[in-house]
From Swiss-Prot:
GO cellular component terms, A-Z: cytoplasm
Keywords: Dioxygenase, Iron, Metal-binding, Oxidoreductase, Phenylalanine catabolism, Tyrosine catabolism
Keyword Iron (UniProt): yes
EC number: 1.13.11.5
Family per similarity comment: Belongs to the homogentisate dioxygenase family.
GO MF terms, alphabetically ordered: homogentisate 1,2-dioxygenase activity; iron ion binding
UniProt protein name: Homogentisate 1,2-dioxygenase
Amino acid sequence: MTLDLSKPANAGYQSGFANEFATEALPGALPHGRNSPQRAPYGLYAEQLSGTAFTAPRGHNRRSWLYRIRPAAVHRPFEPYAGPQRLVSEFGDSADVPPTPPDQLRWDPLPMPVEPTDFVDGLVTMAGNGSAAAMNGCAIHLYAANRSMQDRFFYSADGELLIVPQQGRLFIATEFGRVEVEPFEIAVIPRGVRFSVTLPDGDARGYICENFGAQLRLPDLGPIGSNGLANPRDFLTPQAAYEDREGAFELIAKLNGRLWRADIGHSPLDVVAWHGNYAPYKYDLRLFNTIGSISFDHPDPSIFLVLQSQSDTPGVDTIDFVIFPPRWLAAEDTFRPPWFHRNVASEFMGLVHGAYDAKAEGFVPGGASLHNCMSGHGPDADTFEKASASDTTKPHKVDATMAFMFETRTLIRPTRYALDTAQLQADYFECWQGIKKHFNPEQR
């Protein structure tokens, strides 16, 4: 199967999460019984792409063998990229990362660009923590683009990219094959994988969590049992597909938060066959098996966990990716929206579609909010009054919504861009100022 970036893929997908996949676009392109034969079929080059240390435990080891027309080393030297440099990867105090305020923060959507702007040039870092160089923490980016990448290819050496489209489909042509995502779906592109993004709908906007640390995995289910939340079979990894093109192309690399570019005389999406467990994948959030209370109380939001990046402390993740999808609320004599909360973790939220059930207004699709460690947050005044008076003897369906959260164990530090942008809502705090005093010591 050869790649045509302008049309939907028809090579299909392979089902499963972190499976040992094997796929070939030409019959017999995968060597039989070995990884690196003296001569690979069709005159291809064998190349291993390692996502973990060679000696990582087998259950955590991630690598794939690629059989490609030219090795990845074939390109001209890199030089600093002359385009926009709006990405941050080190989150200590700096000109890019000012002191972090304890305020609750919320932003309007990133505006669509006026000038032609592709996926790479449309990226901007809003917040993050840790260090790409030290391989811990994450960066949270937004993207807004109106042009497909034209003879340009991109990869991040800093981390894996969890892409959450909010507007417009993305056709992502990768070394491993084609991944197509639309709003309500996510894509994960592993560290180092080269790709190009086509925008079939013209405009596109969304969110990215760039994970510097341990790779995303499915959470353990504990007493939920053997099924539930995001089921492994619903994750889709592309079949092999390649393009054999020569010409004047550009390869853009992200390393330590900076962009670099190199001339390359061929398309790097030239992998004819591959096998392994280190590969891009997609997931449809509408397939999430939501768990909730059928008696009383609103459970902790950990029941909405899709993917996690584990830390070295059991039970404490570096990153949790959580969603708030359509669901039934059936708890009786219970305040059903998310409750008021202060959290040792830090929470960056986005909205793909509809409205979030804890905010009556102000939090719109494409927008974002940040509630850092121990910053009080919760439903606004209107939501509290309505939910406190609602009839909880009848179930209620929260419909036409898809919100999500990147939750981290360490402080999420907004960038200078995020604190200075016109999209920052200076009046966000007002949504709680109308909360009334109901206390009466004479009436229980």
